[in-house]
């Protein structure tokens, strides 16, 4: 059987009621299960902010458990005890402001994702793990810088692609597939 078919079979056969849980939601559920019932509320309160950021960043369906995680995480985000998340909120100009899924999707998530796209995923991981406020501030600034770099690279790719299209005759534009060896692999899919 193909891997895709095997996955479909597993999903259909699974007794779990919500089939569209984000990967970060699965990780949260694992933490809760390993922590035990007596620690479930405390663990959820601690990690729901990270799970909300991941759920929103992955553009998951906002229904069922994804919605609960996102709602609770957004509510808890301004009071997070994750030093790195706090530093990123500050560096992004969101500290003390109401946080919605829009701020996550268009402000925080792009900064976190820029690290991986630009070949420095360790910076995002370090930011989320650090307990040192000075280090968190340094990492948050680095992520914001990488995001600006990612935006510039993305704009250059778009300009190059537009130029390639404009050089084509109108009758050759019905279906387009563009590429360039010069386009950054981490950004080209955006």
What does each model-found stretch correspond to?
Residues 16-23:
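Short glycine/threonine-rich catalytic loop with a Thr-x-Gly-x-Asp
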């Amino acid at each position: 059987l193909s891997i895709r078919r095997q996955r479909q079979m597993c999903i259909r056969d699974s007794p779990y009621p919500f089939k569209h849980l984000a990967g970060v939601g699965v990780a949260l559920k694992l933490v809760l299960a390993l922590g035990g019932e007596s620690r479930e509320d405390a663990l959820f309160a601690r990690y729901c902010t990270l799970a909300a950021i991941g759920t929103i960043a992955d553009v998951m369906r906002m229904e069922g458990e994804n919605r609960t995680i996102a709602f609770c995480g957004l509510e808890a985000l301004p009071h997070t005890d994750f030093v790195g998340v706090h530093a990123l909120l500050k560096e992004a100009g969101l500290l003390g402001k109401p946080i919605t899924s829009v701020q996550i999707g268009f402000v925080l998530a792009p900064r976190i994702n820029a690290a991986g796209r630009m070949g420095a995923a360790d910076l995002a991981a370090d930011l989320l793990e650090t307990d040192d406020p000075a280090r968190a501030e340094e990492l948050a600034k680095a992520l914001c810088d990488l995001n600006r770099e990612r935006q510039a690279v993305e704009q250059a790719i778009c300009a190059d692609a537009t130029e390639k299209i404009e050089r084509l005759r109108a009758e050759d534009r019905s279906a387009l597939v563009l590429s360039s060896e010069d386009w950054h692999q981490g950004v080209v899919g955006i």
